[in-house]
Amino acid sequence: MNQRLSALVNGGFLSENEAHQLMHDMMSGSLTDAEVAASLSILAHRGETAEEMTGFVRAMRQKAEPAERSLDVVDTCGTGGDGLSTFNISTAAAIVASAAGAKIAKHGNRSVSSKSGSADVLECLGIHIQSTPEETRRQIQEKNMGFLFAPMYHSSMKQVAAVRKQLGFRTVFNLLGPLCHPMQAKKQIIGVYAKEKAKLMAEALAPLEPEHVLFVCGEDGLDELTITANSYVIELKKGDMTEYTLNPEDFGLAKGYLSDIQVQSPEESAKLIQNILNHQTEGAPLHITALNAGAALYVAGKSESLMAGTLKALETIKNGAAKEQLARLKQKTKEEEIYA
């Protein structure tokens, strides 16, 4: 039996280095499916420690395909798994934030359990998702936003894909994805489906010295800053960790209903996003997009506070800049036309 797995079976905890080696073994295909399943099951049952998570993240980052790491970018992504079937809020927020001057490197995938993954809705919006690393870098520099399609950068995940599908329950990989940005983005908005997992992820990321990251979790269970209730926030900024609760009404945003932001398909999500960016939709969809875009602008250093960022995001939508940015993102480059 694998030495690290043996420690888990016997009720032990792994050091950061041991966790790093276990994840390296998983990603390298040197464990049997049974050993992978046992490791994931034990961790899911007893819960991962922050030290173990840090080791896992280091290993996954090392196994990721090379990507540009010199750009000052922000990622807006989440763990998913909230089961609430909302439209792609973080994707809409990314477009608005990029229209307002933030450089966004959106890391995402197709849907696993939701109605619409970020890759799915971007395709419906007419935005190319399978760009090369070099093309993505150019998109970020020239258009303020590029998409990093997760399977293109985390090919070693195929070693555990079958086991994860067979297990059918959440595993540590649901938490690791947002922490393993291919560009190793130092600025992020990370949505988390549960408050205790947000704390775990923050404690795991802190030793890796991020510049400015917000972990957000709605009291309604949404893995975003929500508009239907208060949101729990953990802020990591240059080594300091603070926790607070955010009430959308403090930002002048009336609380809405989940039913106002739920969709049944990527096509429906894309239509709602277009309406938001065209400023043809008011209420909860507009407000939740602005709130999350405002957070991205705050983390990017384009606004001095969450409040200022939210107001800037609203103005970006109202003055037509967000609509123009969507049109710009749809324009194909020569390279994209060749591979289309």
UniProtKB/Swiss-Prot annotation:
Ligand binding (Mg(2+) 2): 223-224
Family named by the database record: Belongs to the anthranilate phosphoribosyltransferase family.
Residues that bind Mg(2+) 1: 90, 224
Organism annotation: Bacillus pumilus (strain SAFR-032)
Swiss-Prot/TrEMBL GO biological process terms: L-tryptophan biosynthetic process
Xref: PANTHER family: ANTHRANILATE PHOSPHORIBOSYLTRANSFERASE
NCBIfam families found in the cross-reference section: trpD
Assembly mode: Homodimer.
Gene Ontology MF annotations: anthranilate phosphoribosyltransferase activity; magnesium ion binding
Binding site for anthranilate 2: 164
Residues binding 5-phospho-alpha-D-ribose 1-diphosphate, per UniProt: 78, 81-82, 86, 88-91, 106-114, 118
GO cellular component: cytosol
The protein's role, per its UniProt record: Catalyzes the transfer of the phosphoribosyl group of 5-phosphorylribose-1-pyrophosphate (PRPP) to anthranilate to yield N-(5'-phosphoribosyl)-anthranilate (PRA).
Free-text comment on the cofactor: Binds 2 magnesium ions per monomer.
Cofactors that this protein relies on: Mg(2+)
Catalytic reactions on record: N-(5-phospho-beta-D-ribosyl)anthranilate + diphosphate = 5-phospho-alpha-D-ribose 1-diphosphate + anthranilate
SUPFAM superfamilies xrefs: Nucleoside phosphorylase/phosphoribosyltransferase catalytic domain, Nucleoside phosphorylase/phosphoribosyltransferase N-terminal domain
InterPro entries linked: Anthranilate_Pribosyl_Tfrase, Glycosyl_Trfase_fam3, Glycosyl_Trfase_fam3_N_dom, Glycosyl_Trfase_fam3_N_dom_sf, Nuc_phospho_transferase
Transmembrane residue ranges: none
Domain of life, source organism: Bacteria
The protein's Enzyme Commission number: 2.4.2.18
Record's protein name: Anthranilate phosphoribosyltransferase
